[in-house]
């Protein structure tokens, strides 16, 4: 009886495993990650592999902090982490191409593993994690970059930029005082006004149009009405509106 029970369990286990493979539900802990990432056509499977890569990255980032590691081991671990970061990016691109969530949209934002723990140093390009930043040659690069960043001043504090500008930068260009240029601009302005007037001659004025004083060539300029005149005009219009309603 025990033998038959073991056979049944084994057959059931193989059936469930084949069924999970058909549905794209794979146990990532017992299966080796595929190398041909672009050939994967299941979003759940890609999500599983991406999660496994994140776990590996988090584990190696924690290990690279150990003080017992030699410089060679630290360099090898740092190379492995960078390879895993590139693999993670490839899985994210494949998930996006299949219509899944776009994990690459954040660009150089912070990266977290499945447990919500931030992976320090993650981003684009080759990165140094943990004790790899203290390696000979790498530490000097970080110190030089930090010193260069500290020496840079904001644009508001750079007096040399203000010393290099002249009046032309602020619009007081000597070209604006050129007689030939001013005459050319005046001629072009007159030509534009004449074209506008010619185009308006054939147009019909809208109903209720009242030309301003001085537009008819009578020589009288337009004067701004006073507050009393405006109030009296509004009262007259309201009276006329009431009379029309009666």
From Swiss-Prot:
The UniProt record lists the keyword NAD: no
What is one GO cellular-component annotation here?
cytoplasm
* Span list, region Disordered: 196-223
The compartments listed are: Cytoplasm; Nucleus
Biological process according to GO:
generation of catalytic spliceosome for second transesterification step
Protein keywords: Cytoplasm, mRNA processing, mRNA splicing, Nucleus, Spliceosome
Origin, by domain of life?
Eukaryota
Q: Which InterPro entries match?
A: Helix_hairpin_bin_sf, Isy1, Isy1_sf
Subcellular location, principal? cytoplasm
Q: Which SUPFAM superfamilies match?
A: ISY1 domain-like
| Database matches in PANTHER family | PRE-MRNA-SPLICING FACTOR ISY1
Q: How does it assemble?
A: Associated with the spliceosome.
Q: What does this protein do?
A: Involved in pre-mRNA splicing.
Indicate the family of this protein. Answer: Belongs to the ISY1 family.
List the protein's name. Pre-mRNA-splicing factor ISY1
Gene this protein is translated from:
ISY1
């Amino acid at each position: 009886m025990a033998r038959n029970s073991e056979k049944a369990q084994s057959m059931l286990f193989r059936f469930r495993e084949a069924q999970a493979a058909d549905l794209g539900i794979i146990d990532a802990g017992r299966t080796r990650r595929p190398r041909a990432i672009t050939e994967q056509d299941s979003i759940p499977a890609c999500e599983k592999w991406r999660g496994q890569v994140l776990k590996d990255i988090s584990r190696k980032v924690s290990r690279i902090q150990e003080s017992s590691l030699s410089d060679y081991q630290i360099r090898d671990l740092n190379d492995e982490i960078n390879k895993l970061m590139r693999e993670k990016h490839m899985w994210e691109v494949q998930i996006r191409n299949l219509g899944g969530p776009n994990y690459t949209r954040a660009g150089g934002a912070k990266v977290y593993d499945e447990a919500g723990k931030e992976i320090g140093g993650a981003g684009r390009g080759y990165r140094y994690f943990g004790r790899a930043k203290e390696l000979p040659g790498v530490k000097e690069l970080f110190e030089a970059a930090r010193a260069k960043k500290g020496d840079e001043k904001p644009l508001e504090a750079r007096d040399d930029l203000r010393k290099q500008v002249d009046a032309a930068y602020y619009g007081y260009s000597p070209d604006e005082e050129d007689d030939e240029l001013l005459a050319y601009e005046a001629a072009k302005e007159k030509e534009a006004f004449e074209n506008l007037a010619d185009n308006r001659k054939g147009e019909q004025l809208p109903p209720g149009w009242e030309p301003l004083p001085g537009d008819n060539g009578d020589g009288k300029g337009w004067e701004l009405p006073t507050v009393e005149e405006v109030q009296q005009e509004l009262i007259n219009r309201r009276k006329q509106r009431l009379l029309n309603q009666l």
